[in-house]
Amino acid sequence: MALASVLQRPMPVNQHGFFGLGGGADLLDLGPGSPGDGLSLAAPSWGVPEEPRIEMLHGTTTLAFKFLHGVIVAADSRATAGAYIASQTVKKVIEINPYLLGTMAGGAADCSFWERLLARQCRIYELRNKERISVAAASKLLANMVYQYKGMGLSMGTMICGWDKRGPGLYYVDSEGNRISGTAFSVGSGSVYAYGVMDRGYSYDLKVEEAYDLARRAIYQATYRDAYSGGAVNLYHVREDGWIRVSSDNVADLHDKYSSVSVP
């Protein structure tokens, strides 16, 4: 038998007792050249995989929009793992600093890690430059950091919201390194329902209470139609003097308020 035919021999797939584990253990096919196959002397390649190995199952609804009096940020509080509801009290709005907020959509670990890292980098910027980092610079910093890991399985779609000397700022950043400036965004499995409410009721000159009501109604509508969103509506308002947490309303209470009210 030629040496080439030995080296190119396919790996056995799902054979019982493979690698001496016994007991009917089934192992995944790791592919030729994988560690432990006893055939390849070369080091395994740790590059970008040809196909994803883990299917990320997640769902959420987050939104943010700019208006005359700042930026409104709202999110639901349900965490899911496939069809399993893991928690109803997850905080999906991350407080980066007193003037910056970030939202979580995608993998909770990815969002939490990268936005905590962003908070640290923003603080270092302030200490070095003796001034607050701008919303544009913070969002660009996050986009540059995650772009280095493009294609490696990160799952993150976040909005960076804040107020700087240019006024209110809102940017969408995702794990592919995309960065978009805009006036209104919604991210997550329930975003299609939230957009419908926002598109109907949004205007830049909304009064403060009208903006609060619009955000609550948009998240409520998403939780009503999307099984992966629910829990409570956490509402924040970014103003010139910093952000404030406005309210946290259970969607069951909002159902009593909005179920019989038509969208204007």
Swiss-Prot record:
<dbReference type="InterPro" id="IPR001353">
    <property type="entry name" value="Proteasome_sua/b"/>
</dbReference>
<dbReference type="GO" id="GO:0005813">
    <property type="term" value="C:centrosome"/>
</dbReference>
<comment type="function">
    <text>Component of the 20S core proteasome complex involved in the proteolytic degradation of most intracellular proteins. This complex plays numerous essential roles within the cell by associating with different regulatory particles. Associated with two 19S regulatory particles, forms the 26S proteasome and thus participates in the ATP-dependent degradation of ubiquitinated proteins.</text>
</comment>
<dbReference type="InterPro" id="IPR023333">
    <property type="entry name" value="Proteasome_suB-type"/>
</dbReference>
<keyword id="KW-0645">Protease</keyword>
<keyword id="KW-0963">Cytoplasm</keyword>
<dbReference type="GO" id="GO:0005654">
    <property type="term" value="C:nucleoplasm"/>
</dbReference>
<keyword id="KW-0888">Threonine protease</keyword>
<keyword id="KW-0865">Zymogen</keyword>
<protein>
    <recommendedName>
        <fullName>Proteasome subunit beta type-5</fullName>
        <ecNumber>3.4.25.1</ecNumber>
    </recommendedName>
</protein>
<comment type="similarity">
    <text>Belongs to the peptidase T1B family.</text>
</comment>
<dbReference type="GO" id="GO:0006508">
    <property type="term" value="P:proteolysis"/>
</dbReference>
<keyword id="KW-0647">Proteasome</keyword>
<dbReference type="GO" id="GO:0005839">
    <property type="term" value="C:proteasome core complex"/>
</dbReference>
<dbReference type="InterPro" id="IPR016050">
    <property type="entry name" value="Proteasome_bsu_CS"/>
</dbReference>
<dbReference type="GO" id="GO:0019774">
    <property type="term" value="C:proteasome core complex, beta-subunit complex"/>
</dbReference>
<dbReference type="InterPro" id="IPR000243">
    <property type="entry name" value="Pept_T1A_subB"/>
</dbReference>
<feature type="active site" description="Nucleophile">
    <location>
        <position position="60"/>
    </location>
</feature>
<feature type="propeptide" description="Removed in mature form">
    <location>
        <begin position="1"/>
        <end position="59"/>
    </location>
</feature>
<comment type="subunit">
    <text>The 26S proteasome consists of a 20S proteasome core and two 19S regulatory subunits. The 20S proteasome core is a barrel-shaped complex made of 28 subunits that are arranged in four stacked rings. The two outer rings are each formed by seven alpha subunits, and the two inner rings are formed by seven beta subunits. The proteolytic activity is exerted by three beta-subunits PSMB5, PSMB6 and PSMB7. Directly interacts with POMP. Interacts with ABCB1 and TAP1.</text>
</comment>
<keyword id="KW-0378">Hydrolase</keyword>
<dbReference type="GO" id="GO:0004298">
    <property type="term" value="F:threonine-type endopeptidase activity"/>
</dbReference>
<dbReference type="Pfam" id="PF00227">
    <property type="entry name" value="Proteasome"/>
</dbReference>
<dbReference type="GO" id="GO:0006979">
    <property type="term" value="P:response to oxidative stress"/>
</dbReference>
<dbReference type="GO" id="GO:0043161">
    <property type="term" value="P:proteasome-mediated ubiquitin-dependent protein catabolic process"/>
</dbReference>
<keyword id="KW-0539">Nucleus</keyword>
<feature type="binding site">
    <location>
        <position position="108"/>
    </location>
    <ligand>
        <name>bortezomib</name>
    </ligand>
</feature>
<dbReference type="InterPro" id="IPR029055">
    <property type="entry name" value="Ntn_hydrolases_N"/>
</dbReference>
<dbReference type="GO" id="GO:0008233">
    <property type="term" value="F:peptidase activity"/>
</dbReference>
<dbReference type="GO" id="GO:0005829">
    <property type="term" value="C:cytosol"/>
</dbReference>
